[in-house]
């Protein structure tokens, strides 16, 4: 089976240094690409930025789930690191959904599909914009594999940054997490704890 690749990389380097610009040079170099540069000037590009490798930053930031609410801060750090080391960072977003919130409902039908949407959207932006490389920042069940799938499809320099594990909460001096909420629901069904006690765990566990 022939391996799929969305683009073939020419070999062109920056005029100012040795950093390669195999894809962005096609998009922005030359007099005929002035309209493209015009659009990018409007996003904050400078003349100097057009001589730098363009590095996409795929952010999965969302208020949908606590797993991703801090991703925008990590994307800022990634952007800073790229810009300080000779690249031009360009941040874009993709979606995320929460299995933990939608489980047991019709919403679960969208869970696995969302992985494909995430991979497709990252591949679409990176391929269309001509990024020379990209960094994907993810932190939830489906956006992490979605990011990795896009990296494999695009077959260009890329890094995945994991958003980290959610720290446990605390209740009555003990650590509690999402599993404890499920356990509390079970205890309530067995008559071993009240609805108020279940909610007390839910309020602090994540």
Question: What residue spans do the PLM features occupy?
Answer:
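Anionic-ligand anchoring segments at beta-strand to alpha-helix junctions in alpha/beta enzyme folds, i.e.
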Residues: 24-28, 69-113
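Generic structural signal for well-ordered, non-membrane alpha-helical segments
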Residues: 28, 32, 36, 50, ...
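Gly-rich Lys/Arg/Thr-decorated short loops/hinges at beta-loop-alpha junctions or inter-strand turns
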Residues: 16-24, 55-62, 95-109, 126, ...
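Short coil-to-beta-strand
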Residues: 50-55, 87-91
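Generic beta-strand/beta-sheet core signal
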Residues: 58-60, 92-95, 137-138, 159-161
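Active-site cavity-forming subdomains of large catalytic enzyme subunits
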Residues: 111-206
């Amino acid at each position: 089976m022939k391996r799929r690749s969305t683009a073939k990389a020419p070999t062109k380097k920056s005029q100012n240094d040795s950093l390669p610009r195999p894809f962005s040079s096609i998009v922005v170099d030359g007099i005929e690409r002035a309209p493209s540069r015009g659009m990018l000037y409007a996003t904050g590009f400078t003349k100097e930025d057009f001589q730098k490798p363009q590095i996409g930053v795929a952010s999965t930031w969302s208020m949908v789930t606590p797993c991703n609410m801090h991703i925008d801060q990590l994307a800022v750090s990634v952007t800073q690191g790229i810009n300080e080391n000779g690249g031009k960072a360009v941040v874009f977003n993709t979606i995320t959904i929460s299995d933990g919130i939608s489980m047991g409902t019709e919403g679960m039908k969208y869970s696995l599909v969302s992985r494909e949407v995430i991979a497709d959207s990252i591949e679409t932006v990176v391929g269309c914009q001509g990024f020379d490389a990209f960094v994907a920042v993810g932190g939830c069940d489906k956006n992490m594999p979605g990011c990795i799938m896009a990296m494999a499809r695009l077959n260009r320099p890329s890094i995945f940054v994991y958003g980290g594990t959610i720290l446990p909460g605390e209740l009555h001096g003990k650590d509690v997490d999402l599993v404890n909420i499920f356990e509390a629901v079970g205890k309530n069904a067995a008559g071993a704890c009240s609805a108020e006690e279940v909610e007390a765990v839910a309020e602090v566990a994540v």
